[in-house]
Structures are given as C-alpha cells and as structure tokens.
Amino acid sequence: MQQVIIAADAPWVRKEISSAIEDLGIKIIEVNHGVEVLPIVKQENPNLIILDFQIGNMGGPATALELHLEAESQRLPHIPIALCLDRRADVFLAKRAKVEGWFIKPFNPIKIRKGVQALLKGDSYYDSYLEPITLPPKNSLQG
C-alpha cells in the first residue's frame, strides 16, 4: 500500500488534503510540525510527502531541502515532495526547494487528487494558478 505523509500544523489543511485522497487506497500519515517529518520518513518510507508552506517549527521549503540533502547523501531514498502554497511569491521559493509539485490554497479537491495520482506515478504536478503572467513584448502592444 502506498503511503503519503501530510505535514501541516493547521488541522483544516490536513483534513482537506486527506479528504480528497482518502478513497485512493493510500495510507495517510499526518504530522503537525516540520521537524517531525524526517523521523517519520525514516520510519515509514512513504511514497509522497505533502508539506504546508507555512508549517510551524520548520517551514515547508526548509523541510523539503532537508529531505533532499538526506537523499543526496544517500541516507534516504528520493521521495517526491509537494508544497501547499499561499501566494505567488511562494512559487519562486517552491522552485528553489526543488519540489516535484505544489497545490494552491484554497484547495481544489479535484486538483489535489489529480496531483497526488501524478506524483505517485513519478510525474510532477504544478498547479499553474499562481504562475507569473507572461506579457507580450512592449513593442507588440503599440500599433
């Protein structure tokens, strides 16, 4: 059975994510603080980790970077990570944290479900809602 860790200090975040995926036959492990993620990962060996960007004690990006460092030093296998983002600036930080996906708050359960399924298959999933807007070149606006 595949396992997903959901790490968020806000109960509503954990509830909304788990509700969207609970019928997929996945074991869901909930964690309240970023510092609790690494020990649980070592114990449970999950298939996916979902981190709230604003998680207490250790933010989502810092937790993601810690997990990547552990994997790079071969103390952990590589495990896909998704972040739950609040605002457009978070996209930049999520990219810097080298996560395989992200979800945007307020959550869309269909997107969460689709994203979790993609990430568990080894694909990436990026909700494009907060992506920066690309404007046409300045000279093409004149005319």
Predicted features and spans:
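Conserved acidic segment of CheY-like receiver
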Residues: 1-12, 17-21, 49
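Acidic, metal-coordinating helix/loop segments flanking the phosphotransfer/catalytic sites
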Residues: 32-48
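His-Asp phosphorelay/catalytic-motif detector in bacterial-type signaling
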Residues: 47, 72-80
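Two-component signal transduction core modules
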Residues: 49, 102-103
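Conserved phosphotransfer microenvironments
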Residues: 51-69
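Alpha4 helix (beta4-alpha4-beta5 surface) of REC/receiver domains from two-component response regulators
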Residues: 62, 83-102
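C-terminal output helix
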Residues: 107-116
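CheY-like receiver
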Residues: 123-143
